[in-house]
């Protein structure tokens, strides 16, 4: 049974959303939001985003959203003290991440990562992209320091990292 306790009800919401890749009826991993996924030797994953795909606010979903997550969030010790998601590690090694163009990104490991695509298709999918256009005003590397300090105070946050965390929670964000 997938849902046993009241707190497991969150899985209903999670499975109700599209993800980058998902399982088809034969339980094969196939593109969902992505237009295409190229996998080479189980170690190089190239994602091609659908043209015209947008975030819920209508802003384009682009490679910048992946770059922002990888460089400015996942590897930022203030936002992710434990570092990038464990599913991104192969024998302790992080992937090389590349933006190939506005709609194409690539992750490359020196060894195969058999857990990467299944993690993206899971009930609580691996996070690899965030809406950069929306979150940059809450990130210390992008926001005007005075404006950010005012937002931290106005929202009664401990610091900019807590404020960023509140706004990056897609299940709890109010705007």
Predicted regions and their residues:
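N-terminal lobe/hinge region of extracytoplasmic solute-binding protein
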Residues: 1-41, 71
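Extracytoplasmic
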Residues: 15, 32-34, 40-44, 61, ...
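Hydrophobic/proline-rich hinge and linker segments of small-molecule sensing/allosteric domains
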Residues: 20-22, 46, 129
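Short, solvent-exposed secondary-structure boundary motifs
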Residues: 23-30, 82-91
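Aromatic- and charge-enriched surface segment that lines or borders ligand/interaction sites
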Residues: 36-80, 106-111, 116
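Surface-exposed binding/hinge segments that line
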Residues: 38, 85-171
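Extended, Lys/Arg-enriched charged tracts that mediate electrostatic binding to polyanionic substrates
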Residues: 175
């Amino acid at each position: 049974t997938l849902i046993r306790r009241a707190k497991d009800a969150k899985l209903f919401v999670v499975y109700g959303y599209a993800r980058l890749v998902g399982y088809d009826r034969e339980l094969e991993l196939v593109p969902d939001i992505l237009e295409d996924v190229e996998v080479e030797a189980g170690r190089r994953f190239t994602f091609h985003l659908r043209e015209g795909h947008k975030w819920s606010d209508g802003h384009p979903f682009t490679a910048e959203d992946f770059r922002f997550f990888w460089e400015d969030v996942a590897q930022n010790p203030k936002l992710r003290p434990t570092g990038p998601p464990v599913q991104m590690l192969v024998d302790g090694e992080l992937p090389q991440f590349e933006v190939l163009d506005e709609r194409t990104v690539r992750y490359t490991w020196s060894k195969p990562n058999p857990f990467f695509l299944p993690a993206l298709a899971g009930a609580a999918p691996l996070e690899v992209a965030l809406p950069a256009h929306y979150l940059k005003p809450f990130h210390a590397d992008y926001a005007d320091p005075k404006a950010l300090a005012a937002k931290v105070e106005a929202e009664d946050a401990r610091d900019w990292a807590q404020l960023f965390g509140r706004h990056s929670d897609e299940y709890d964000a109010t705007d």
